[in-house]
């Protein structure tokens, strides 16, 4: 059957009966849709009979909220799918509810196919039912012309995937601080204005649960705080975080898709309290298990400032059924960023001027990042490694190409008695002096680049197809012109300082000063094709490097494999 880029799944079975079938329905839908899957809940609706079915309100109960949570949890095993549960017809217990929309709702990705769990008695793709389904879908949402329709049956499944059924006792996935949630059928209260906050990096299904609950509770406006600047410093692999504007763009599209009747105020979150700590018009705050204490702190802060407490709604974390050894066991952006390590982040450079049978990697990183250990791991996998520090030593040596120009520029007092350049004395001359440093680098960098080209020729002569240039100043020196890809090793600055102090015997202040004189990890990553990290145990670093190497072999053009 054809695969569609976007689809709409209309669920008509009562939620309690739907639970045992949820996994197979999602699996079937994932076979037919390869990008965006919208989900519309209309329990109890029939697609048989002459009357055209109409969208009707669904009471927001704790059972509905739990179902939304478990649907997103079940969808997490289908990582190619961007699932979005539409909330326009899900209504809280409130006296100020706006009427259901009378016009169709526009969607960011108009569905190309409409799917349903509704089943005919004979288990066929009965045309009148499919026609009713298409009419219903197009009366509610903007869909593509010539909308296809499919009734999902068990024979569409490709095997069950783990998902918690709803017909077994489970703790509520959302619980207000007061009152405590009662039965699953208990209606959920609505509020005028509320808030939710987070980093929202690479919007995932746990984010979607948090945001969906907040959207259901809010009837007029939702304030969404998006962490930025200082609040990002403690994040794992912050260099791989999406830029603030990109996170806001994806977040805003999702919010408008699922509940366009709300007014969304998406703002940067620059401190732990944000507007939730000071806005008197806010009534509720949605938090996760991890941020519940932060919500309590916000309420204490509000009381200290003569503001009413917010109603806190706590969401359970979603379990990540596919997490690996060094990843969190919950669905998290941190794990997503870890999985990016070793992947190609942007297209390689085209370098027709380089040897056609050699593919060149430029490996860089801040001091203490472990890039040289990564270079040795790549060497063990078959790469030819060029150490730019070693080339610098060769260039400085008496008779080397940089020796005479450096002595002429800085004087003979930088020499040892035996005529060798005293690099410590030379370093003291240029450190902190931009003019003197530029004089030195203008001499050294072109010479090292020339020596690197000679080493690349040697790699070709030895029959190597991959060459790695290990260089801390790769980008500052402009040596990216010598490579097809830039690979960067990243490490938290605190860990880099610890390693420098331990390795080089420097004080913490001296180590920090060294790092401040270099390009930051963030600046390096912005120009990198592949990112690696030595933050974890050595065998995890090895696994990363092997992954990066294996992916590299798949994308190296055949011309670079000619000597194999």
Swiss-Prot record:
UniProt-listed InterPro entries: Cyt_trans-like (IPR004821), Depp_CoAkinase (IPR001977), P-loop_NTPase (IPR027417), Rossmann-like_a/b/a_fold (IPR014729)
Entry keywords, A to Z: ATP-binding, Coenzyme A biosynthesis, Cytoplasm, Disease variant, Kinase, Mitochondrion, Multifunctional enzyme, Neurodegeneration, Nucleotide-binding, Nucleotidyltransferase, Phosphoprotein, Transferase
Keyword Transit peptide attributed: no
Signal peptide (from-to): none
Modified residues (Phosphoserine): 178, 183
Major location (coarse): cytoplasm
A molecular function (GO) term: pantetheine-phosphate adenylyltransferase activity
Enzyme class: transferase
TM segment ranges: none
Pfam families: CoaE, CTP_transf_like
Catalysed reaction equations from the record: (R)-4'-phosphopantetheine + ATP + H(+) = 3'-dephospho-CoA + diphosphate; 3'-dephospho-CoA + ATP = ADP + CoA + H(+)
Stretches assigned to the DPCK domain: 360-563
GO cellular component term of the entry, any: extracellular exosome
This protein's pathway: Cofactor biosynthesis; coenzyme A biosynthesis; CoA from (R)-pantothenate: step 4/5; Cofactor biosynthesis; coenzyme A biosynthesis; CoA from (R)-pantothenate: step 5/5
GO biological process: coenzyme A biosynthetic process
Disease involvement: Neurodegeneration with brain iron accumulation 6: A neurodegenerative disorder associated with iron accumulation in the brain, primarily in the basal ganglia. It is characterized by progressive motor and cognitive dysfunction beginning in childhood or young adulthood. Patients show extrapyramidal motor signs, such as spasticity, dystonia, and parkinsonism. Pontocerebellar hypoplasia 12: A form of pontocerebellar hypoplasia, a disorder characterized by structural defects of the pons and cerebellum, evident upon brain imaging. PCH12 is an autosomal recessive form characterized by onset in utero and death in infancy. Brain imaging shows microcephaly, cerebellar hypoplasia, micrognathia, and multiple contractures.
Assembly with partners or alone: Monomer.
Identification of the protein by name: Bifunctional coenzyme A synthase
Organism of origin: Homo sapiens
Gene name in the database record: COASY
